[in-house]
């Protein structure tokens, strides 16, 4: 069931996409994190903002 309400879409995007991902262990961290919560590495990247496209 796709979302049509713009307010709900905004909430979902904030919860899903505004994260940082550790390049060493793959753990999700908060956007304000400077070190990984799992392996304590400082090698973090922002999570990709696009959903993967489905292949036919």
From Swiss-Prot:
UniProt keywords (A-Z) are: Ribonucleoprotein, Ribosomal protein
Sorted alphabetically, the Gene Ontology BP terms of this entry are: translation
Q: Which Gene3D superfamilies match?
A: 4.10.1060.50
Q: Which SMART domains match?
A: Ribosomal_L40e (SM01377)
GO CC term (a single one):
ribonucleoprotein complex
Q: State if Signal is listed as a keyword.
A: no
What Gene Ontology molecular function terms does this protein carry?
structural constituent of ribosome
NCBIfam families linked to this entry: PRK04136.1
**Entries under PANTHER family matching the protein:** 50S RIBOSOMAL PROTEIN L40E, LARGE RIBOSOMAL SUBUNIT PROTEIN EL40
Give the protein family: Belongs to the eukaryotic ribosomal protein eL40 family.
Its recorded name reads Large ribosomal subunit protein eL40
Q: Which organism is it from?
A: Metallosphaera sedula (strain ATCC 51363 / DSM 5348 / JCM 9185 / NBRC 15509 / TH2)
Which gene codes for it? rpl40e
């Amino acid at each position: 069931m796709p979302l049509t309400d713009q307010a709900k879409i905004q909430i979902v995007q904030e919860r899903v996409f505004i994260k940082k991902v550790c390049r060493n262990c793959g753990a999700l961290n908060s956007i304000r994190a400077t070190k990984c919560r799992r392996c304590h590495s400082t090698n973090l990247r922002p999570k990709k903002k696009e959903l993967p496209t489905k292949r036919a």
